[in-house]
Structures are given as C-alpha cells and as structure tokens.
Amino acid sequence: YCTRQILPGMVRRRRGHIVNIGSVAGSTPYPGGNVYGATKAFVKQFSNNLRTDLLGTPIRVSNIAPGMAETEFSLVRFNGDAARAAKVYQGAQPLSADDIAEIIYWVTGLPPHININSMDVMPVCQAWAPFAIHRQEM
C-alpha cells in the first residue's frame, strides 16, 4: 500500500527510488521458513515487475535481500524465546541493521542512470550450502 500511495508522486516529479527489503530466504529455502520464504520471494518478484512497469521513467526499484542479520526476527520467529533466539547468532558475526542501512545508502546514492535490481547480502560466516553457518569454537 505504501508503494501505491507514493509512486504517483514519484512519477509526476520524475524522480524517486523504491527500496524493498527482501531476504535471501526468498531465493533459497531453509527448514521451517516456508511462509517467510514465500513472502520474500513475492517481494523480489514484486520489485522486478514494478521496475518493468516503470520502464521509461527514471524511477528506480531495488530489492535488498539480507542473509543472517541480528534483528528481532529470531525473537519473533521463536515466539519471544530469547535464549533460543540468541543461539541463532552464537559464535557467528551476523549482519546488523546498520550494515543494511549502509547498503541502502550506497544503492540510493548511485548515479541516477544506475539501478540495482536485487542485491543478496550475507555475512562472511554464511554460505549457500544451505545457509550453512560456520561457528567459532566457544
């Protein structure tokens, strides 16, 4: 609904950049993440289709897809179980909200003729096999 409200003004002004936050889970599944992954796959496809619909305008659309990021996500996922949520990040160095903000700042600061369609971002401790996490010995 936010896009629907703000997009007409962007088109009229002939400037703007819509940044959607997806997830690498929208491209690669993980156990127990079926609904979350499906919604993030939608965000990616919505972003791609919106950019296609805006072809011929200078409006940019980007989908930023973080991997493991230490946010309230795990706390919500585990119904408020703080100990279980903390174990997700134990021994790893996940992305932070500041890291994602820095990426958004960079993407939106590029010259106006450049559009980053989608960007997968993971901490170096994470890989695609499937979302394997290397943990340091504690």
Spell out what each predicted region is.
Residues 11-12, 54-56, 69:
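A short hydrophobic alpha-helix cap/turn motif
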Residues 8, 48, 52-55:
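Alpha-helical segment proximal to the catalytic Tyr-Lys
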Residues 3, 39:
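Active-site helix of classical SDR
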Residues 23:
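Residue(s) in the substrate-gating loop at a strand-loop-helix junction
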Residues 28-34:
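Active-site loop immediately N-terminal to the catalytic Tyr-X3-Lys motif
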Residues 63-67, 83-130:
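C-terminal helical subdomain
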Residues 5-14:
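A short helix-coil junction within the Rossmann-fold of NAD(P)-dependent oxidoreductases
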Residues 66-76:
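Short, flexible catalytic-loop segment of classical short-chain dehydrogenase/reductase
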